[in-house]
Amino acid sequence: MRIKMVSAYDRAEEVSKLFKEYTDMLIENDSSFQKYLDIQNYSEEIEHLESKYGLPDGRLYLVYCDEELAGCIGLRKIDSQNCEMKRLYVRPEFRGRKIGNLLVEKIIDDAKEIGYSHMLLDTLPFLKSAIHMYKKYGFYAISSYNDSPMDTSIYMKLDL
């Protein structure tokens, strides 16, 4: 198994494909998630990836497993001290191979290198394996930090 991680800024079509799979999965498990996407101006995000995830304050990666598109992750600036992990997604056929771990480790390392003090994220209760992984890396539960309309959202923070 050969894994390769690449910067995704010039691969908008592949990013869009993975983001769509990710959001479709979330909506399938909780139809109210569509309202959250609308609040986040999700359609704008896809069209302007660099404005949300651009260098020097953000990151956007794709990962390939044996040359097949396997997953993605993003990092966006909230303010000078805080960043947010976004759009962690590993395609179902590639899960269980520690690809999610590689993506999370990379984005944490990048956040430290940029100089952020804290990384935030929000997730949903049915993403149990992701929540377990976040806790393994030191994330802990916090109160809401964004305008999510999702009553079930779980908010987490990592002190970098």
Regions found by a protein language model. Name each.
Residues 1-17, 21, 160:
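Conserved N-terminal entry element of GNAT/NAT acetyltransferase domains
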Residues 6, 20-49:
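Conserved GNAT-fold acetyl-CoA-binding loop/helix
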Residues 45-62:
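A short helix-loop-beta-strand connector motif used in the catalytic cores of GNAT acetyltransferases and
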Residues 62, 68-76, 84:
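Conserved beta-strand in the GNAT
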Residues 77, 91-97, 125-126:
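Active-site acidic-Proline motif in GNAT/NAT acetyltransferases
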Residues 90, 96-109, 136:
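Conserved acetyl-CoA-binding loop-helix of GNAT-fold acetyltransferases
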Residues 117-160:
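C-terminal "cap" of GNAT-fold acetyltransferases
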